[in-house]
A protein has these predicted regions:
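Conserved phosphate-binding elements of NTP-dependent enzyme cores
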Residues: 1-891
Length: 891
């Protein structure tokens, strides 16, 4: 990818290159036949708070065009259609709506500003009546001079020979009469001519029948019935990134900073009496709770019912106030008057957060944009739909012939992109989902769908584990997408460990045999059939069944040591209750979007942390977590980097480097020169090279060329001063030791028990190939997660600790998964409990207990489909996980 991208970028001008990602020339002799390359990574790099699924996939751009060109503006006052008329369209509507022979008058209104100007002039004058008469007279004379000699008021025609013929003081409900006609097909041209005069002189036309019925028309974009002005739909009106379209209150973000009632009432599943309103539980605010009790009695509000179960109007009364009760809003408004006190400002800050914008209700667009509809839905309403619902909406959308012709190509693009998103298994996401909240796998599949939608050909696509986050049920759809990319004329290169994807590949390149120092060789290249016959390939051994991840002979039994979540109702969780056994490996499974992360992260992890006073963010809704006191600690082991600087490395993370520094500080040379352990650290001044500050390299910015990272000239990349490098242990200096692999270091330091015990856990989790001083920035997400796992294993005891892992098999080969499961068993043997969110069937089949959520994603999920041992789940009808377990147990 680096070479394909580099060659393409080099073909651009120097000016253009400075805005593009800059690639180093890879260390390779020659690459022949390479195409321009696109890399679709497995991480979510989006930080923009405005970016959504719809904007990233370009669906939003097509929706903006669709609403601007084919949308119907509906007046938010009278709910009638707002449109701009022409004389021809108005004439056609009149002749269509009036039966033949119906007599009618063609009128235009005397503009309001004329009437207002006359009154305004009269008010300023000393003799108001005479001036008003003069102004009215002047206006009537101007009408006569233009040839308009008839007025119409209250169903009566007024012949105007001279100004004195008009007997009224104002022009309210007074119209200029242009023509009198009877509805018939042959009057169309005369009617068009009359309407042209109306639009030219008054920008509006009134058709009034002899029985008093009216038809109103205007050549301006206003509501003819209540006069409300509207913006003519243009694409930028529907952009929340444009000041023209964004809600002026929240500036297009959809939320504003204020009192977050989700923090004020953190758990609405408890009653007002039990302390649902968190600030009222403070002793200093006991008076406010008493006021609430008094108000509740007078308003007949049940204090013993969970707040969430109270009727909506009662909830609103509690929050926003009622007669005799200021409400929570009033309580915080009162606190605002006391903000000169520091403790009050600190107290209020605890309850401030981002809340839904009160003006646009979180829809991000101004009222004029929200008034435009297609198929009875506004653009924000469509964006709030799930991708599956949006796809159904546009597939069944019916429009009139004229609008259908305008929207034809736009609808084709929208439907095509929605179809691709459904096919990559993202149908449960909403179009308005913030891109920054997507998982790495979801972000990657959105990029994949976007690229497929662009229909590029002759391109090299490089994908890094696109199956991440996908349930086996959705894998076949993903493979179909990749095959479609190939079939339209692209090369698709996939880094993947998923067996089904490997079996579907046209050509397989196997690198190995093992990792690190023992890898980097081409083991095999060819098709799947030839791979199975390969003797040297570790991948082939697992595919053939020569090596396997074994199902345990017996599962750990469920004991009385359990955590029970009662009434979880966050996001799509449907008031579920679930039991999580401790002292074993528990897998939470289900299709993408079924609620796994919500249950484990937002409810269980956040709930247990909140109970310990270690959590300040919002917690998912639940009634109760029973058994939380059975665990002393809960630890989330994720795939975030273990460090963000080149000086961070695996041995510093697991505290093994302290022992290495002590070994060097204990040598005779170090003692003679009075060097202590800190002299062998590259994180603090003393022994490190101060030119590169212990990183071994210096970076030079090159503007439109790629930044150049040069080896430090002073220490020659060795990180330390020369006098520190002169200190040796068993003939090796600190730089040479840091360049050893973990396997080599175990043999080298075999006499240092304190160090060996920590290094061995890194080898136990399959990281023996890493170098001691390898920069944390070069580690993959899976490697970083296993380093964290090793640090917990190194502590020897994990008594009463609950470890939570989210897809720990990401980036792992079959052999690596085997090692990971061995480490999991060691953690449990040390007294820990493991809760793992996982799609990999090899891990799920080895679990002691499985909790399967679903049955579908999004609104179709959030239910407990099955719980039990893998064998029990395999026999549950309707469980997709059970279906694949059953297939696995049958082989």
């Amino acid at each position: 990818y680096a070479e394909g991208q580099r060659r393409y970028v080099e073909s651009l001008s120097a000016y253009a290159r400075q805005f593009l990602e800059r690639m180093d020339k890879p260390d390779v002799d020659e690459i022949i036949g390479i195409s321009p390359a696109i890399a679709i990574r497995q991480k979510n790099s989006t930080k923009n708070p405005r970016s959504t699924v719809a904007t990233q996939t370009e669906i939003y751009d097509y929706l903006r065009l669709l609403f601007a060109r084919a949308g119907t503006t509906i007046c938010h006052v009278c709910s009638r259609e707002v449109k701009k008329d022409s004389p021809e369209s108005a004439a056609d509507e009149v002749l269509t709506r009036l039966t033949e022979g119906t007599r009618f008058f063609v009128l235009f209104p005397i503009q309001d500003d004329v009437s207002r100007a006359i009154v305004k002039t009269a008010k300023k004058a000393k003799t108001r009546t005479s001036v008003k008469e003069l102004s009215t007279s002047a206006f009537l004379i101007s009408l006569l001079q233009q040839g308009f000699s008839r007025l119409f008021r209250s169903g009566e025609m007024i012949e105007l020979q001279k100004p004195e013929d008009y007997l009224f003081d104002d022009f309210d409900n007074t119209f200029v009469l242009i023509d009198r006609l009877a509805s018939a097909a042959d009057i169309r041209q005369r009617l068009v001519d009359s309407l042209e005069i109306c639009f030219r002189e008054g920008h509006a036309a009134i058709i009034e029948t002899t029985d008093g019925k009216q038809l109103k028309f205007s050549d301006r974009f206003i509501c003819k019935y209540d006069g409300t002005r509207y913006e003519e739909p243009e694409p930028h009106l529907f952009s929340f990134n444009s000041p023209f379209g964004a809600c002026p209150t929240c500036q297009g973000f959809g939320n504003t900073i204020g009192i977050d009632y989700g923090l004020v009432i953190p758990n609405p599943l408890i009653s007002l009496k039990a302390g649902a309103i968190e600030p009222f539980t403070r002793p200093t605010n006991a008076w406010a709770q008493k006021e609430l009790v008094k108000y509740a009695a007078s308003a007949n509000i049940d204090m013993n019912v969970p707040f969430a179960d109270l009727p909506d109007y009662q909830q609103n009364c509690v929050i926003y106030g009622d007669e005799g009760w200021r409400g929570l809003k009033g309580f915080f408004a009162w606190l605002e008057t006391k903000k000169y006190k520091l403790h009050v400002r600190v107290f209020r800050a605890k309850y401030r957060g981002y809340t839904k914008c009160p003006d646009c209700d979180g829809q991000r667009l101004r009222q004029a944009a929200r008034d435009v509809k297609i198929g009875k839905c506004s653009l924000p309403e469509i964006v709030e739909m799930s991708i599956a619902d949006a796809f159904t909406f546009f597939e069944t959308l019916e429009m009139d012939i004229e609008r259908a012709q305008i929207a034809d190509k736009l609808l084709l693009e929208i439907r095509r992109r929605l179809k691709f998103l459904v096919e990559v298994g993202l149908d449960y996401l909403t179009l308005g989902r913030l891109a920054a909240t997507l998982s790495g796998g979801e972000a990657q599949r959105i990029q994949l769908a976007t690229n497929l939608g662009s229909l590029l050909v002759g391109t090299l696509y490089v994908l890094d584990e696109p199956s991440i986050g996908l349930h086996p049920r959705d894998n076949s759809r993903l493979i179909k997408i990749l095959e479609n990319l190939r079939d339209i004329g692209n090369t698709v290169l996939v880094v993947e460990h998923d067996e089904e994807t490997i079996r579907s590949a046209d050509h397989i390149v196997d690198i190995g045999v093992h990792a690190g120092e023992f890898g980097g060789e081409l083991v095999f290249a060819g098709d799947f059939k030839a791979l199975l016959a390969s003797e040297n390939s570790l991948t082939a051994k697992y595919l053939r069944g020569d090596a396997e991840i074994k199902i345990p002979n017996k599962r750990r039994p469920v004991t009385k040591q359990i955590i029970e979540i009662v009434g979880a109702r966050e996001h799509n969780l449907n008031d579920i209750s679930v039991t999580i056994p401790l002292d074993m490996l528990v897998c939470v499974t289900g299709v993408s979007g079924s609620g796994k992360s919500t249950l484990v992260h937002d409810v269980l992890y956040a709930g247990l942390k909140k109970k310990r006073g270690e959590w300040n963010s919002p917690v998912g809704f639940f009634k109760e977590i029973k058994g939380g006191d059975l665990v002393d600690d809960v630890i989330l082991v994720d795939q975030s980097p273990i460090g963000r600087t080149p000086r961070s490395n695996p041995v510093t993370y697991i505290k093994a480097y302290d022992a290495i520094r002590e070994v060097f500080a204990g040598t005779n040379t170090a003692k003679t020169k009075s060097y202590n352990a800190s002299h062998f650290s590259f994180n603090v001044p003393g022994g490190r090279c101060e030119i590169c500050q212990g990183s071994g390299t210096v970076t030079i910015e090159m503007q439109f060329l790629a930044d150049v990272e040069l080896t430090c000239e002073d220490c020659r990349g060795m990180r330390f001063k020369q006098e520190i490098l002169d200190v040796k242990y068993k003939g090796k200096n600190i730089h040479e030791v840091l360049n050893m692999t973990i396997r080599e270091a175990i043999l080298f330091f075999k006499d240092v028990a304190k160090l060996i015990s920590r290094l061995k856990v890194l080898e136990a989790v399959g990281l023996g190939y890493l170098r001691l001083g390898q920069s944390a920035t070069t580690l993959s997400g899976g490697e970083a997660q296993r380093v964290k796992l090793a640090s917990h294993l190194a502590q020897k005891t994990a008594n009463n600790t609950l470890f939570i892992f989210d897809e720990p098999t990401t980036g792992l080969h079959f052999d690596d998964i085997n090692k990971l499961l061995t480490a999991f068993r060691a953690l449990i043997d040390n007294g820990g409990s493991l809760l793992v969110i996982e799609h990999n069937m090899d891990v799920i089949k080895t679990a002691d207990w499985v909790i399967d959520l679903g049955p579908e994603g999004g609104v179709g999920g959030g239910e407990i489909v099955a719980t039990g041992t893998p064998e029990q789940v395999a026999n549950v009808e309707g469980s997709f996980t059970g279906k694949y377990l059953k297939q696995m147990f049958a082989t």
